Amino acid sequence: MKPLLLLVAVALGLATVVSVVSAGPEAIECWFVEDAGGGGLSKKPATLLLRHGPRGPPPRPDLDPKLYFKVDDPAGMLLAAFRRYPAGASAPHCEMSRFIPFPASAKWARSLSPEQNCPRALDGDWLLVSVSSTLFSLSSLLRPQPEPLREPVVITMATVVLTVLTHNPAPRVQLGKDAVLDLRFAYAPSALEGSPSLDAGPPPFGLEWRRQHRGKGHLLLAATPGLAGRMPPAQEKATAFAAWDDDEPWGPWTGNGTFWLPAVKPSQEGVYLATVHLPYLQGQVSLELTVHKAPRVSLTPAPVVWAAPGEAPPELLCLASHFFPAEGLEVKWELRGGPGGSSRKVEGKTWLSTIRHHSDGSVSQSGHLQLPPVTAKQHGVHYVCRVYHSSLPASGRSADVTLEVAGFSGPSIEDGIGLFLSAFLLLGLLKVLGWLAAYWTIPEVSKEKATAASLTIPRNSKKSQ
């Protein structure tokens, strides 16, 4: 029994070690940005302490105590995002600034804030924290305590009230496929907030998705679930999951605002802004959607190109068809086999054609190779065109043809099959000719006897008649 208990204890210890190792960073270094006057901005170092050891928060004498924050996250969304942050990943970019609660300015969202003046419960300091990385992007509203704690370390407590989060800040979608833009949000009213309404359950909220492309903003979808009011129609057949996950009476609450865009086109590339509106509070994240489509690669003439010694083979055309984006296509030519046997750069004149556009938004482009005269030693070499594009893996995509030099080609399998069939048909033809010759060489008398014999009626037949 003791060995079993020992194994259980070891397993629990390993699980604890793994959880500690994978718990993400202890603190996030940020920049506190504020107006410096005269149109300029000032930046000061700040830190969000996410967790600490049993000895308490580590001292940070290099920071202003009002910019050293110990984070309390009742909903847990901000802390959960950082717990999954890999240890070897580059540090996320973090900025914070002051935030002033205000009612939503959009007409469709005015029902969220019936009073234009913010409740006194929202008075005090607010911080807007924006974190961006390759793994996630989030925006959080924090409510710091008025004064820092002095013991055991000078630090300011800050409570997370609203978090808006996406786990895929840079989605890449294949041309013609559906785009699903992830969005989650969480809300935990602080004790100081004191909701003016006594109604239990999550508060009303508004969801807004906009796209910015080439400097232009475009509202795609707006929703205020459960509230009356005229909403602008959704554009481009877009839909979204706009709902709280639960209706617990006092929170905290989490919600889903994931956006769905069917059959994306190149014109739908751009930066998408997702905004969650609560009464007098807002959180926003940005996602950059890119559209791609890998090219199909073909090489002509194929699979064999012929040339006589001292003559140039026909021009080779490497076609990269129906790809997107149009920029960044690269075609490289290689020569495999022949003297040396290794792959090397091919000699000849190369160029790219102009881009051809297709109705689905994709494009095609071809690379050309004009070869110099060949020699007998080049018989059997392979000309390879390799296409590189942002939609392809780093190794690219290739097609090849084989050079056959006239007078140096040995019989192939196809040649052997053709010879066998030819011999079989020739043998059959010879037999037929032999039969015909034998028939026509029979003497005429024998033919007449054979004919008379075939016309003689037997006597037995006459009697029967």
Swiss-Prot record:
Site (May be involved in interaction with TAP): residue numbering on this chain: 431
Q: What GO biological process, any one, is recorded here?
A: antigen processing and presentation of endogenous peptide antigen via MHC class I
Q: Which cysteines are joined by disulfide bonds?
A: 30-94, 318-385
InterPro entries, A to Z: Ig-like_dom, Ig-like_dom_sf, Ig-like_fold, Ig/MHC_CS, Ig_C1-set, Immune_Resp_Modulators, Tapasin
Ig-like C1-type domain location is: 295-402
Q: Chief localization class?
A: endoplasmic reticulum
Cleaved signal peptide residues:
1-23
Please give the name of this protein.
Answer: Tapasin
Organism equals Mus musculus
The root-end lineage is:
Eukaryota, Metazoa, Chordata, Craniata, Vertebrata
